[in-house]
């Protein structure tokens, strides 16, 4: 699957027209926040299978259209959605990566899945979640009744890389106590395009350039850095994981980026051991976004994912 040399042409001529066949739909989540989702449905299928894609912080459905395209052409119906406060969903605070309650992320996800899965009798349901989406999906899989057969967690947000963990967590807690939860965390601010060369997301300049173009052409989906409340709530959710993870009984594949600089891989390794049925695969020569990497890396990741999903456990 070689796309990089002609990615721009592929995206404009094939990917976007494909994705636009499936309109954005909306439903109301907790506190009446409007949630955006797309359901990519096969025209005819005797046996239907569903792939649920759960994106990460500051991401959006349009960014995930390439992966949706790939799974759709493997015969899946595909569900994508944007979390509250980002993408095409309603913002809690304009421009800022803010959150009211972490559990609302999980409740929103459950409501969207329930709505879509009521439309068809799916013989198989698979889930692929990335980073913050993997943290949310972990809570969903542990605490909600569901019919997901297997799940892939890509670079799960199971820990934050903090230079001074005790001091930094104290500052985060204090800022929330002092009523400063809606402020950007120190060092973060309004949306900026990612640097093609010096970024912590991917080695693939081609896909990063395309992501920047998406945000430039669709400024409404731009999102700045996280607030103190967002970080505080996510840290609390991470701390509760040792009690949450053991509840998940389905097979789990965890994708760990070798060159990770965003999430804490050491904490990930400790938590992976708590899953009843999980294995971790280290993706060589990959930064945080393993599914948006260079063609050769991405191809191998998808090969591993498909093997995991299609081989009987």
From Swiss-Prot:
As for subcellular location, the record says: Cell inner membrane
Q: List the catalysed reactions.
A: a 1-acyl-sn-glycero-3-phosphocholine + H2O = sn-glycerol 3-phosphocholine + a fatty acid + H(+)
Q: State the source organism's domain of life.
A: Bacteria
Keyword tags: Cell inner membrane, Cell membrane, Hydrolase, Lipid biosynthesis, Lipid metabolism, Membrane
* EC top class named in words: hydrolase
Q: Which GO terms describe its biological process?
A: lipid metabolic process
CC per GO annotation: membrane; plasma membrane
Q: Name one GO molecular function term.
A: lysophospholipase activity
Coiled coil residues, start to end: none
What EC number(s) has UniProt assigned to this enzyme? 3.1.1.5
Q: What is this protein called?
A: Probable lysophospholipase L2
Species of provenance: Haemophilus influenzae (strain ATCC 51907 / DSM 11121 / KW20 / Rd)
């Amino acid at each position: 699957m070689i796309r990089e040399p002609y990615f721009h042409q592929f995206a404009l001529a094939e990917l976007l027209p494909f994705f636009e066949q499936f309109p954005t739909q909306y439903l109301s989540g907790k506190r009446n926040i409007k949630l955006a989702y797309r359901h990519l449905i096969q025209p005819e299928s005797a046996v239907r299978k569903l792939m649920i894609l759960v994106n990460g912080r500051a991401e959006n459905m349009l960014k995930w259209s390439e992966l949706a395209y790939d799974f759709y052409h493997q015969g899946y119906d595909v569900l994508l959605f944007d979390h509250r406060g980002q993408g095409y969903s309603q913002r809690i605070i304009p421009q800022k990566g803010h959150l009211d309650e972490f559990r609302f992320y999980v409740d929103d996800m459950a409501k969207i899945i329930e709505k879509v899965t009521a439309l068809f009798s799916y013989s198989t349901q698979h889930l692929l979640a990335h980073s913050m989406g993997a943290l949310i999906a972990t809570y969903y899989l542990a605490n909600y009744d569901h019919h997901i057969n297997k799940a892939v967690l890509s670079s799960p947000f199971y820990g934050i890389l903090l230079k001074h963990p005790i001091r930094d967590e104290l500052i985060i807690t204090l800022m929330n106590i002092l009523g400063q939860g809606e402020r950007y965390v120190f060092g973060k601010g309004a949306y900026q395009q990612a640097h093609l060369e010096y970024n912590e997301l991917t080695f693939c300049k081609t896909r990063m350039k395309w992501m920047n173009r998406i945000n430039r052409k669709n400024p409404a989906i731009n999102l700045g850095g996280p607030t103190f409340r967002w970080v505080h709530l996510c840290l609390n959710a991470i701390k509760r994981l040792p009690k949450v993870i053991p509840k998940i009984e389905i097979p789990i594949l965890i994708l760990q980026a070798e060159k990770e600089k965003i999430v804490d891989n050491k904490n990930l390794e400790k938590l992976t051991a708590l899953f009843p049925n999980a294995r971790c695969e280290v993706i060589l020569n990959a930064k945080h976004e393993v599914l948006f990497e260079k063609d050769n890396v991405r191809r191998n990741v998808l090969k591993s994912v498909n093997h995991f999903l299609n081989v009987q456990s």
